[in-house]
Amino acid sequence: TVNHNRDQGMLKTDRLNQFKVNINNNNTSFRLNLNIDLSKGIKLVVNSFTTLDSYHGPLEDVRTAYSLAFYANPVDFAPTYPADDTYNWPHLRFGKSRDSDNPYALIQRGYVDRSRFSTINRLEYIQNLSFLLKGLEFRGDVSFSQAGYYSNPYMTTPFYYSLLDYDHVTGKHTLEALNPDEGKRTLLKGSGTTTGSNQLAYNIKILHTAAWKDHTTSYLAVLSGQESLQSTPNSVLDGIRRRNLGLSMRLSYGYKERYYLEGSFGYNGSERFAKDHRMGFFPSVGGAWVVSKEPFLLGSSKWLSFLKLRLSYGKVGNDGIIDTPRFVHLPSIGQDQPSGSFRPGLGQISRYRITGYQNNDVTWEIAEQANLGLETKFFNGLFEATVDIYQQVRHNVLANRTVIPE
């Protein structure tokens, strides 16, 4: 599918302006979803979504201009003045007082072009392996996403005037230039903004489900990897791709649709820590009991439709503990600005100093979590209630110590 939207504003460009300032916003999106049966039991899934946004509009925020217009006094100045005998060459003569701004000049003095794009593409391979084991399935997928944004402002310096004299009989007026040396009609490019990022991720999955008599089981194993890069790095280290690797498994068991047990773990790797601390093991276990399906509660099913108790405990790891430095196990060295020398006759010198000491003991921040929950429904779902008792304890929290305790 292809979709395109175009929105325009209601700002009028002055006839003496050499560029358009009205808002013009275009949005285009493309979406593709394909399911391809390669052969019996083998499927290929393709998903793609792309958006393109382009914006042209006034340099100043329209909300700011409207706010200034609300408080502007029309007695102080006119939006623009006609030419007088002195300032009669073709240009916009914006009115202004020394104590307030002209909102019309803010809108007409320049424009900004902005563009934003993003694309997400995913390819998945699915194969049914029931010929090896009933309920066994293999999945592998790779996805690529990219996003970018740029903004370029273009501006002039308005010519501001005040009304010095006005003859009510002849209608002749005299203007006073408030900024004759600073005003310019030439468009100048301001400081632009450019950002971008891309990410590549892949997953390999093994799934298995089975059911026999009163028993049900399910198994899932996932090997995942991810790498990302910012297109506008601030340093050499920021220009290196960020990478993560993980292996996770989950096994669940159910009996008579009343009793459930589940165990899982994640074995994750991060590049941010020293060699001995890059891998983290994070297990979890949980169970649930659907009390409403017990024989001793079947007589209350008219008013108690559902009652479930659940309990879980697990650990979750976090490697995004600090933005800077990126690699906490590497020292950081910075250069000071030139300053006075330590010895006469040497002039100014630049000094190098350690801005961050390496720490080989920093590792994953661990959130240890426990949860006790209750879910219930009354009168066939007319009333529902969910109650959770939750506790979380964090370990290995990284913090800056400003005062060393005695």
Language model: regions and residue ranges:
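Transmembrane beta-barrel wall of Gram-negative outer-membrane proteins
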Residues: 1-57
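Extracellular/periplasmic, surface-exposed regions of secreted and cell-surface proteins
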Residues: 33-38, 42, 48-52, 71, ...
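Short intrinsically disordered, low-complexity coil segments enriched in acidic
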Residues: 1-7, 12, 73-80, 327
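Active-site-proximal polar cores
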Residues: 160
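Charge-rich, acidic-biased intrinsically disordered regions
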Residues: 52, 57-58, 63-64, 164
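Functional cleft and adjacent loop/helix regions within the main domain
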Residues: 77-87, 389-392
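The feature marks either
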Residues: 88, 92, 98-99
